[in-house]
Amino acid sequence: MKYSIEVGKIVEGALKHDYAKVINYTKQLIEKLEEDDETRAANKFSKLLTAQSETTLSAMGMEKVNPVPVDTESRTALADVIYPNENKYEVILSKNNEEKLKSFILSYQNADKLNSLGIGVSNTLLLYGPPGCGKTKCAYLIARELGLPLVVARLDSLISSYLGTTAKNIRTLFEFAQKMPCVLFLDEFDAIAKARDDSNELGELKRVVNSLLQNVDSMSSDSLLLAATNHENLLDSAVWRRFDYRLEVELPDNEAIVEMIDLFTTNTIELSQKEKKELSTVFKGLSGASIEEIIKKAMRNAIIGGSDFSKKSIYDEFFVHKNILPQNYQSDKELMSIKAKYLRNCNEKIFSFQVIADVLGSSKTTISKLVKEEID
């Protein structure tokens, strides 16, 4: 049955007198009806909502109907809610990971069809890999593509020093996320999902993992749970099994790096494909976050220093980021020699003496001599 998720949630909310759930899922149903050109039905449901009392109408903003729960001790919110119109993150992934992410999104978008065939929906995704590679941005992308709010757990509030409070907070957060159409995102997941056989951990953490597993198991099939970790080796084996999709978000490949260079230099400088290829060679092995940081710092320094932002600015900031330049150097020639040799060692075919000269603002003859150590 089409719209079975929304109808089921509305009925469930009505039976439990959960008006937040009724309103939020009715709004989602209206949006889907409008997308399918079911204008008459959409208008009918819209009129039902707008005919409610002033109190209910004021609650139609999700944050009023369904306030974000707080930790009972600190009174701080257990999560931040990011709405689709506030979600501006862009993420660039390898083509393989892009396809896997699309598959996960399509699974949810076709939930009605899958449920009608008795197949069920894959609604849990674990993102893992090195820091700065886009795991968090993937969560934002999924929520935006689905047009759903992203509920981002706040670990500083979720984890409590009081016995039993962390497990209680986890349960409260899961209950909150099931009251509305949303994507629940648990970042730095290993903090609450560590292996229970770790002898260095206290019994409290083991109770937390047990609570987490119970809450994941009790999630309805139409809810979405995303989790991310930089330390997948620390996760409890039972936690791994709870995730239908597991996506390793790796360091960007050359193609992804070139796309990042395009994105981060938009409306600033024009780089040729050859120049982008050269930059992607030196950026190899860096995370997307590091590449963004290098380019934005170079841009910032150029603006503050009153100079033009150029590819040389990017290379200069790259050398600083890699920390290959000595703090105490004898001459500018020494610095240029270090930079020239570094680029040459990256790839001799790409970084010819002429290319290095263009990058460093020198001559081909000088660079040749520096690389061959013919200048004292």
State what each model feature region is.
Residues L29, A139, L173, F189, ...:
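Aromatic/hydrophobic pocket-lining residues that form π-stacking "cages" and hydrophobic walls in ligand
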Residues N96-K100, L106-L271:
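Walker A/P-loop NTP-binding motif of AAA+ ATPase domains
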